[in-house]
A protein has these predicted regions:
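Long extracytoplasmic/lumenal interhelical loops at the membrane interface
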Residues: 247-302, 350
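Charged/polar, solvent-exposed surface patches and flexible loops
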Residues: 242, 263-266, 270, 316-320
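Hydrophobic transmembrane helix bundles of membrane-integrated enzymes that assemble
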Residues: 1-238, 287-375, 381
Length: 384
């Protein structure tokens, strides 16, 4: 597991070598089989509602894949993300022992890309508006990797001057000197969430921290709602884009997204009832730069409903996890996956989906084990 967590961030950076992704999936299968055979969990006792929702989404996607007859790469990527959820379920305790590997890989990813950009642009790299993705395909992928690495270093790295420089100087320079608009918004949100976490640690004001956290998440949901208004026909795209004034989102890219989104939604409306309920296809030949619209296109209203149930179910367990670091880490992962999904089909990116689903599974198992320990403790007290 330590090797997997260390290698995953580096494999994402080496995206052009697709064979590495397949090797990682094989490794995940082997890890899952090994740990299941070693622990031999009671599946009937351990089965949770969240597990059932994941399985139903996988079955629904399989039916869509069989119906469409194409999109095997999409199917492979999404199913591998679901697989990572179950890896998190069985490795929940082992993952916490491997945070050092996550941190080391995070430093490698940040500074390899930083020196690559420095060699490419020189000391003018701060004026760069489009970095070309550095060692990633797009700036969005690069910025997501920087934020993810920054989170791992902040949460698990040793407190040093080097860590502070990395988190507060290098990472923001890499993200804000790029064309990754949505990731800039998410980076600000992640900084705010981490600030709330440290405020809670110092003041022990969990309720106040919860209020601030709700305010941030509500603000993000409001931004998402405003962005999608033109696609749903509630307002014109010129008005929404003018709100951002090109500060975070590239105007030309947003206009093209609105055109694509409306075309996809119009196509879905023209389909029959079965297609609207269960999806129109895998969308291998359609450009859909949105997680939410892609779910509707591929899985229909049923898939949207199941996805909403999955989010609610996972967040239910997140709010009940006792370890506050795990709680904030899970919240940040959810913000990154769902926030990136506004302008990127993040569930089909193994870089964006694997870690959030892995930690989701870990949280569900952690809460389940904590409940069992509390029950045993209660029984012992009654006997005494």
């Amino acid at each position: 597991m330590t090797f997997f967590l260390f290698a995953k961030q580096l494999v994402d950076m080496l995206y052009q070598y697709q064979i590495l992704d397949y090797i990682m999936v094989v490794l995940v299968f082997l890890l899952l089989i090994y740990q299941t055979a070693l622990v031999r969990p009671n599946f009937r006792k351990r089965f949770m509602l969240t597990d059932g929702i994941i399985i139903l989404l996988g079955l629904l996607l399989t039916v869509t894949f069989i119906r469409s007859g194409n999109g095997y790469q999409i199917y492979f990527k999404v199913m591998s993300a679901f697989l990572l959820y179950f890896v998190g379920r069985v490795y929940y305790d082992r993952i916490k022992e491997c945070y050092g590997g996550l941190t080391l890989a995070a430093y490698f990813v940040i500074y390899i890309n930083f020196f690559t950009r420095l060699c490419h642009f020189g000391f003018a790299f701060l004026k760069v508006q489009n970095a070309g993705g550095d060692l990633y395909y797009y700036d969005t992928d690069m910025a997501f990797a920087m934020i993810l690495a920054m989170v791992f270093i902040t949460m698990f790295g040793r407190n040093t001057v080097f860590k502070l420089v990395t988190v507060f100087v290098i990472c923001p320079c890499m993200v804000f000197s790029s064309d990754a608009g949505i990731q800039m918004v998410l980076m600000i949100a992640v900084y705010a969430i981490m600030a709330i976490y440290f405020m809670e640690l110092m003041s022990n004001q969990q309720r106040l921290a919860g209020i601030f956290l709700v305010m941030i998440i509500s603000g993000l949901l409001g931004i998402i709602a405003v962005i999608y208004m033109p696609a749903l026909g509630f307002d014109n795209s010129e008005f929404v884009i003018s709100l951002f004034q090109g500060g975070f989102f590239n105007n030309d890219n947003m206009y093209s997204r609105y055109v694509d989104w409306k075309a996809v939604l119009d196509n879905c409306r023209e389909q029959g009832l079965i297609a609207r309920l269960f999806g129109s296809g895998m969308g291998a030949d359609v450009i859909i730069q949105s997680l939410y619209i892609k779910i509707f296109y591929s899985l229909g209203y049923v898939g949207l409903g199941l996805s909403l149930m999955l989010i609610i179910s996972i967040m239910y367990y997140v709010t009940r996890v006792e370890d506050r670091k795990t709680f904030y880490l899970a919240v940040i992962m959810a913000v990154l996956l769902l926030g990136s999904g506004v302008t990127v089909n993040s569930i089909e990116s193994t870089q964006m989906s694997w870690f959030p689903l892995l930690f989701s599974g870990m949280v569900v198992s952690s809460v389940q084990v904590e409940k069992e320990k509390n029950r045993r403790g209660g029984r012992i007290c009654l006997r005494l």
